[in-house]
Amino acid sequence: MSYERRIYQHIIPNLGPTPLNKLTTGDIQQFYTGLKQNGRLLRQEQYGEGLSDQTVRGIHTTFHAALDKAVSEKIIPKNPSDFCRLPSAKAREMQVLSPEEIQRLLIQAKEDGCFELLLLELSTGLRRGEICALQWDDLNFNTGELQVKRQVHRVKGELAVSEPKTKASNRSVILPPPVLMVLSNYKTEINSAWMFPSPLNNDSPRDPAAVRKRLTAILERAGCKRVRFHDLRHTFATLALENGMDVKTLSTIIGHVSTATTLNVYAHVTDETVSYTHLRAHETELHL
């Protein structure tokens, strides 16, 4: 959830009428409790009425920063959200598609007209907003270099295009020759500056939310487990590490701020890879 949605869909409607100097820790705690119980505005039948722990913590982060600003400008003497109890910071479980599931997914994606987008995602690990923001000018077919320099996201309900969220997100990725060939053939069918234009308007990028819905439908038809689009990014990263890519290179490709972030997210993969390498080395010694 973007910070604009946190502010305009949740914080202002619930706490906006209360003057800052009258806002108490209890008011904010009650607000967070309400979000957990019935704060979801969309897809209630699918996910329930309450927001997830992660989303509530994200709303707190945005609101706490705003109140800190009010303190620094001497509008209020202290931040009333400092002592609020927050839901536990449990990370959403990462899911990775198996090679067999990847094959089934791509076969089904060909039938559903989403093959090129999903193949590129599984070959690069781009974020959903980044892949939707790609233009043909970003890709050099001679060198295979793909520039990632913008993202698509929603601001006040409208699609917007902006620079990536961090300096590290602004990066280049080298595509494998087979992927380049697929994109070259695909380009002849697309009459748009956008690599993946909106089906409704060639002059606009594809809506990341529409891509998410499309993926869900394709996964179901392909008989694969239900995963998020972000899990395709995890799938790329996991397979890259398992096939010998070093963490520093992977960190650059997927746009992490530091290798420490990559190590933290994929520690289980690197640990398993190291253990496997040591085991094979030991087996080799035994056969000498």
Language-model regions, residue ranges each:
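Short, Lys/Arg-enriched alpha-helical recognition elements, typified by the DNA-recognition helix
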Residues: 1-71, 80-83, 212-217
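Short functional hotspots where side chains directly engage DNA or cofactors
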Residues: 82-83, 143-148, 198, 228, ...
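Conserved small/polar residues in nucleotide/adenosyl-binding loops
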Residues: 277-286
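Catalytic-site neighborhood detector that most strongly recognizes the C-terminal catalytic loop/helix
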Residues: 88, 96, 152, 202, ...
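Basic, Lys/Arg- and aromatic-enriched nucleic-acid-binding interface segment
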Residues: 41-44, 49-53, 57-59, 72-136, ...
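Short basic/aromatic active-site micro-motif
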Residues: 23, 58, 225-243
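Active-site/catalytic core of tyrosine-dependent DNA strand-transfer enzymes
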Residues: 5, 99-100, 143, 151-155, ...
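C-terminal catalytic core of tyrosine-transesterase DNA break-rejoin enzymes
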Residues: 72, 115, 119, 123-130, ...
